[in-house]
């Protein structure tokens, strides 16, 4: 089986790219069409557009993730394949509602589907995928393995042909999840120490800045850091009805959060990757 390193832009998956040789390194980028979220460096925008094969306007993650992946490619000395799917706007338009913890179609459409389509083009037979779960994340690994079929492979529903004028859908087995950091007992402290004084820049926190898995207080802090991006998330609420907000269980809108007063200064260290949403593969 071919071996693929799945990269999210964080220190953990980047550690895998730097320390575990694979046939491919693949990174899936979340994009937006919104010019208010324009990536500021025109030259880098063009580089990213060339890598993706489609115009790159901006991302709804921290812009630093772009520099992370460019730095990482130089540091490891191996090509990183960049992939992308629909823009977040198009994903929401197709769904007609917002995602939530039980229907994380944002992750499926913007992370998994682009990687699956890349796999179809380049490999198209079951392959091993190194996933960035650390030694203390065995429960996450267990949940992933519980989704595999009898052959130990994850499946994807995809178009496999045509039936008259209609698409013919089928189930394709494609990914054998592998957890090298769990196998080698690698914890966060080892990874943090490894990246000290290395020429790779990292974002403070990965995944979309307005991910609904983040604590509302963290969303307020993210608004202070990335006002245009959080306002993008706020603008997408109430697609379906008045209670169609990112925090459905709380009936709490991003506009409510944005209006909160800053009673105390929230420091970066008040939050960790448990607050990030874990959308990275």
Give the positions of each predicted feature.
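Nucleotide-activated chemistry modules centered on ATP-dependent adenylation/adenylyltransferase
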Residues: 1-281
């Amino acid at each position: 089986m071919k071996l693929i390193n799945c990269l999210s832009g964080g220190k953990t998956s980047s550690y895998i790219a730097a320390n575990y040789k694979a046939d491919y390194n693949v990174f899936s980028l979340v994009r937006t069409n919104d010019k208010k979220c324009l990536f500021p460096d025109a030259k880098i925008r063009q580089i990213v557009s060339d890598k993706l094969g489609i115009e790159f306007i901006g991302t709804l993650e921290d812009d630093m993730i772009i520099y992370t992946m460019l730095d990482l490619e130089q540091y490891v000395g191996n090509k990183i394949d960049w992939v992308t799917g629909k823009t977040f706007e198009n994903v929401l338009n197709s769904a007609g509602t917002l995602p939530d913890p039980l229907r994380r179609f944002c992750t499926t459409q913007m992370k998994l589907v682009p990687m699956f389509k890349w796999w179809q083009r380049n490999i198209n037979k079951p392959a091993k995928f190194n996933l960035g779960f650390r030694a203390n994340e065995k429960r996450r690994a267990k949940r992933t393995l519980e989704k595999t079929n009898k052959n130990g492979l994850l499946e994807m529903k995809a178009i496999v042909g045509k039936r008259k004028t209609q698409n013919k859908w089928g189930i394709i087995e494609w990914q054998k999840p592998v957890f090298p950091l769990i196998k080698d007992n690698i914890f966060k402290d080892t990874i943090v120490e490894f990246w000290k004084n290395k020429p790779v820049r990292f974002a403070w926190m990965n995944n979309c800045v307005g991910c609904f898995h983040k604590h509302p207080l963290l969303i307020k802090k993210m608004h202070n850091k990335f006002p245009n991006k959080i306002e993008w998330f706020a603008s997408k609420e109430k697609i379906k009805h008045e209670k169609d907000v990112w925090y459905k269980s709380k009936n709490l809108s991003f506009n409510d959060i944005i209006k909160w007063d800053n009673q105390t200064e929230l420091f970066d260290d008040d939050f960790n990757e448990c607050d990030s949403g874990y959308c990275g593969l």
